[in-house]
Amino acid sequence: LGNKVKALASEYGKPPVNAEPSFHGDGSVTFSGGRPYLKFDEKALLADAGMILSNGTSGKADVSVLDEKKPDLTEKEAKEVNVVLGWYTTEFGIDGSRDKNIEIAAKSIKGVYVKPGESFSYNQSTGARSKENGYQEAPVIINGKLEPGIGGGVCQVSTTLFNAALLSGLEITQRANHYSPIHYAPIGRDATVAEGIIDFAFHND
């Protein structure tokens, strides 16, 4: 019983997790999962559950919650989101470092919930493009030329998101194009980003 209580404390003692979206061919979207952060009185729970077991009866043990942090998107809230407003895809070749940067950036915005009246910032959501965060050196566009730099490829994610937001009818509040045309989106449909300098942002109006 003690090990079970410790396992529960360990599971719920982790940072909260948002409900995960699943997209379907008919244009609908469903969510599942999601978990809050909970800190509870382990000794009190163990004593209460132990008493129930020692009495040979069935029942529910009381849990004294000491601290709680809900995820940004709970499963209950997610059920209100059931339609895909817009989507967009871009293609990329085989480049290990660039592919890794795209993966990290895409994962950092996956499941982000922008409620009505709220705004989204790409730079805030993806965080620092640094080696500490897993980003690798890959080609980036500087003054119209490809140069090696940490985080090359993240602009493809911001461009893909920009087009999805645009097709969804969301208000684009910050967006800048690259110095020169890029291969993965039509001219005028790209969104470059530079940490601390250029951001892509939209508002859910």
Regions found by a protein language model. Name each.
Residues 1-205:
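Surface-exposed, secretory/extracytoplasmic low-complexity segments enriched in Ser/Thr/Asn/Gly/Pro
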